[in-house]
């Protein structure tokens, strides 16, 4: 696999010599001071001298004080050159290495011993409740020396300060506040979790996976990093729930939501079955509507803790576009309107839109709102069946309805999107017409980030398991080539690894909250590795093992464009995005078919009306798509893969999705997901403080042009991270480095449309509203309408308005040219550390 990071440290920073003994304090001290000297100034820089005299010596003497010195001494220099962020990361990496066990095996035993002591049991060689998983400990007992030999500690030095701090604070295992893992130990633990350790090729598979993850070519979702290889081992990212219109179901969903949030999952819930305000209950009762339920789940999200250093609980509730409580729901987060009792503060909301609603918006027609208990079954329909039933309900005088202007409602929705960033928009017809889960039923909601579309009902909790390919590290900058086969191979490794995670996940089988109600149990059984997962036992295991869903996507797409000098809003970018996504889909499908050849397809593959059994993949749902014409056969051996797919089936019902990748992109120093960079100068929070980052690609290009100086740093700051008004920068450079608010808002829609044929699920698509736009609400409406016309499944995740505070209000920097040094390719000896 030719990922540029898989076998080396970061290009342009590959100044770490081979053979450095990282366990020798004297050698590492010498190395760090040499790295500090890898910057030169026309005048000797007192800040860098202070870095020598204080930071490195503090590292050798006192870890805690060194952390504070690092923040004070290095981070203020980062705006002058991105390499300071890597220097800070390298110093932090060394501090971590001298304060964690010397080998991976020692770390495993240390964790087990510490957890065992907490539980009153001392034996590092045996499994301990709350520690690492039994299979990890057993495998380390047998193969510890081989695993230790795989660890490449130099790779810890390829992370910038933001990335390594995120890993250490949010992912690495601590017991009683003592840190046991450095980044490489995290990656090895995750690689082992993603491997079938009973396989004859286990060590080879661990090595392959470890190389990709530690090389920043493959990034696993947060729950995998948190829990992979531990006894808790919930590695799923997303859970989708469907709530019924009765107190038993509502109570059950509250309990299930609390349970799943505690497992580090993000939650998406369908609220559309709940009857509207004033609807009849029993003989004389009346419903309070969805408002109180929103507030209930809002409090759940605020009250459940996912554990130290992990992300807070988060829930998204979805509502259909014809629900009679539409306006109560719409204003539930707007402080100036609605009933305060029904307010939500952290609960996110999504709207499920039909083609019929969009048609009536376009034609300026009326739209009818109903209570679900008056139109039972309507939410299960889509397409022409929905249109016929909806019109019949409108024509029925016995059914109560509220009539509104479709265009006015759409405008009010867009106003809320501008004001609050929500609701998300999910296009129901596009989702279901191109669903791999048609054989299961109608999809009625998405997940927390609006990229997962899987079937769920009151007796089945949909699950998804995520990864992203760091596509920017498959670019050869010197030749301008992209290693598409390497991307496909990485997607295959992700697919194989996620399948192992699905099999090994701790499904909490005895948890009453995750069981079917007694009168709704069946005798269906799924068997994996000799363990029978009964439908009557657990709703999560049933869904995950029956359908084996995955969501493999990408991060760093804009990094690819910037490396290759391609504007984000160009036709070249749209075509390149499609090729990259095709590579990911090809690699994932190829591996899933290979697994099916060995182990068989996913169990629900054999159910009636399964589109995979009909020989269809996602691109086959698109009208006019021709496999011979539209697949890139010169790059990918699609014909061979499709032949095997038709013969053996596929091991996963869905393999691709496009998640937002916010935290993992930070760890890997990439622009998030498929998005354009938000600014060329931005602030990042680390620990208790913040520091400013300059776009590293822009800085390099300006440095190559001889334009990187103190004046340029100041100009970028004065323009709030934009370079469009800095006329001394060549126009072609300004085109390449337009930010998310400066590119044509249609560009991200076109990127999504380009990659959608190769995404089984959907795309977490944001909109960044341009500055100084005359009518932002109108622009939001146009963006959603364009997404609908281009057949996207997700019309919108977040709508990003203009931040209230300009970024230059924080940490205004004053640099002189002497502060703006250039990296020196060779290391410079320093007499101060030669002793």
UniProtKB/Swiss-Prot annotation:
It comes from the Viruses. It comes from Ostreid herpesvirus 1 (isolate France) (OsHV-1). The record marks 830, 833 as: Interacts with thioredoxin/glutaredoxin. Substrate binds at residues 222, 237-238, 266, 447-451, 660-664. InterPro entries: NrdE_NrdA_C, RNR_lg_C, RNR_lsu_N, RNR_R1-su_N, Rrm1. It catalyses: a 2'-deoxyribonucleoside 5'-diphosphate + [thioredoxin]-disulfide + H2O = a ribonucleoside 5'-diphosphate + [thioredoxin]-dithiol. Disulfide bonds join 238-464. Keywords: Deoxyribonucleotide synthesis, Disulfide bond, Oxidoreductase. PANTHER family: RIBONUCLEOSIDE-DIPHOSPHATE REDUCTASE LARGE CHAIN, RIBONUCLEOSIDE-DIPHOSPHATE REDUCTASE LARGE SUBUNIT. Ribonucleoside-diphosphate reductase holoenzyme provides the precursors necessary for viral DNA synthesis. Allows virus growth in non-dividing cells. Catalyzes the biosynthesis of deoxyribonucleotides from the corresponding ribonucleotides. Belongs to the ribonucleoside diphosphate reductase large chain family. The record marks 238, 464 as: Important for hydrogen atom transfer. This is Ribonucleoside-diphosphate reductase large subunit. Heterotetramer composed of a homodimer of the large subunit (R1) and a homodimer of the small subunit (R2). Larger multisubunit protein complex are also active, composed of (R1)n(R2)n. The record marks 797-798 as: Important for electron transfer. The active site is at 447 (proton acceptor), 449 (cysteine radical intermediate), 451 (proton acceptor). It is an enzyme of class 1 (oxidoreductase). GO terms for molecular function: ATP binding; ribonucleoside-diphosphate reductase activity, thioredoxin disulfide as acceptor. Its EC number is 1.17.4.1. One of its GO terms (biological process) is deoxyribonucleotide biosynthetic process.
């Amino acid at each position: 696999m030719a990922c540029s990071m898989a076998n080396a440290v970061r290009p342009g920073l590959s100044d770490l010599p081979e053979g450095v003994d990282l366990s020798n304090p004297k050698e590492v001290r010498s190395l760090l001071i040499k790295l500090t000297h890898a910057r030169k100034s026309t005048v000797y820089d007192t800040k860098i001298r202070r870095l020598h005299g204080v930071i490195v010596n503090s590292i050798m003497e006192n870890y805690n004080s060194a952390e504070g010195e690092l923040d004070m001494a290095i981070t203020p220099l980062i705006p002058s050159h991105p390499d300071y962020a890597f220097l800070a990361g390298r110093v932090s990496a060394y501090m971590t290495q001298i304060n964690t066990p010397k080998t991976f095996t020692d770390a495993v035993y240390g964790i087990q011993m510490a957890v065992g002591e907490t539980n009153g049991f001392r034996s590092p060689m045996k499994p301990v409740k709350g520690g690492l998983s039994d299979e990890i400990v057993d495998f380390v007992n047998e193969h510890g020396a081989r695993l230790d030999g795989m660890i490449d500690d130099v790779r810890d030095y390829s992370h910038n300060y933001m990335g390594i701090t995120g890993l250490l604070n949010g992912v690495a295992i601590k017991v009683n506040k003592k840190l046991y893992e450095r980044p490489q130990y995290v990656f090895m633990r995750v690689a082992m979790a993603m491997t079938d350790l009973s396989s004859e090729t286990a060590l080879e598979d661990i090595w392959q996976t470890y190389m990709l993850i530690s090389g920043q070519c493959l990034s696993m979702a947060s729950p995998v990093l948190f829990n992979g290889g531990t006894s808790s081992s919930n590695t799923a990212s997303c859970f989708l729930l469907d709530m019924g219109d009765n107190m038993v179901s509502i109570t059950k969903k509250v309990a299930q939501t609390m349970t799943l949030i505690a497992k580090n999952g993000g939650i998406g819930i369908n609220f559309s079955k709940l009857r509207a305000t004033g609807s009849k209950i029993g003989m004389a009762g009346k419903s309070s509507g969805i408002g109180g339920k929103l507030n209930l789940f809002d409090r759940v999200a605020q009250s459940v803790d996912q554990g130290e250093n992990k992300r807070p609980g988060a829930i998204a509730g979805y509502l259909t576009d014809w629900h009679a409580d539409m306006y109560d729901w719409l204003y539930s987060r707007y402080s100036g309107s609605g009933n305060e009792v029904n307010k939500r503060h952290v609960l996110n909301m999504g709207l499920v839109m039909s083609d019929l609603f969009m048609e009536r918006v376009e034609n300026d027609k009326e739209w009818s709102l109903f209570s679900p208990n008056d139109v039972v079954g309507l939410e299960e329909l889509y397409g022409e069946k929905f249109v016929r039933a909806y019109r019949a309900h409108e024509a029925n005088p016995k059914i109560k309805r509220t009539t509104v202007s479709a265009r006015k409602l759409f405008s009010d929705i867009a106003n809320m999107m501008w004001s609050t960033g929500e609701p998300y928009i999910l296009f129901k017809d596009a989702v279901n017409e191109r669903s791999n889960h048609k054989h299961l039923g109608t999809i009625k909601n998405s997940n927390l980030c609006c990229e997962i579309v899987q079937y769920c009902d009151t007796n089945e909790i949909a699950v998804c398991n995520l990864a992203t390919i760091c596509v920017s590290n498959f670019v050869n900058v010197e030749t301008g080539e992209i290693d598409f086969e390497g991307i496909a191979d990485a997607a295959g490794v992700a697919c194989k690894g996620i399948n192992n995670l699905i099999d090994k996940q701790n499904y909490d089988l005895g948890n009453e909250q995750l069981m079917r109600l007694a009168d709704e149990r069946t005798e269906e059984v799924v068997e994996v590795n000799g363990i029978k997962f009964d439908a009557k036992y657990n709703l999560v295991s049933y869904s995950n093992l029956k359908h084996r869903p995955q969501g493999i996507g990408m991060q760093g797409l804009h990094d690819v464009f910037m490396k290759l000098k391609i504007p984000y809003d160009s036709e070249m970018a749209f075509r390149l995005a499609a090729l990259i996504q095709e590579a990911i889909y090809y690699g994932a499908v190829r591996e899933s078919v290979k697994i099916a050849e060995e182990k068989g397809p996913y169990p629900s593959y054999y159910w009636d009306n399964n589109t995979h059994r009909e020989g269809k993949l996602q691109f086959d749902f698109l009208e006019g798509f021709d496999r011979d014409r539209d697949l890139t056969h010169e790059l990918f051996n699609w014909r061979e893969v499709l032949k095997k797919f038709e013969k053996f089936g596929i091991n996963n019902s869905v393999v691709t999705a496009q998640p937002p990748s916010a935290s993992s992109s930070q760890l890997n120093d990439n622009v998030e997901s498929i998005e354009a960079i938000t600014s060329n100068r931005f602030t990042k929070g680390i620990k208790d403080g913040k520091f400013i980052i300059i776009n590293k690609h822009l800085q390099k290009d300006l440095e190559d042009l001889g334009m990187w100086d103190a004046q340029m740093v100041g100009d970028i700051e004065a323009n709030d991270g934009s370079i469009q008004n800095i006329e001394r920068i060549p126009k072609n450079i300004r085109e390449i480095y337009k930010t998310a608010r400066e590119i044509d808002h249609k560009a991200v829609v076109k990127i999504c449309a380009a990659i959608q044929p190769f995404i089984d699920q959907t795309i977490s698509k944001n909109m960044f509203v341009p500055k100084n736009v005359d009518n932002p609400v109108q622009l939001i409406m146009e963006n959603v309408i364009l997404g609908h016309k281009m057949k996207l499944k997700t019309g919108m995740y977040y709508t990003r308005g203009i931040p209230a505070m300009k970024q230059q209000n924080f940490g205004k920097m004053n640099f002189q040219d002497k502060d703006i040094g250039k990296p020196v390719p060779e290391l410079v000896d320093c007499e101060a550390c030669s002793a």
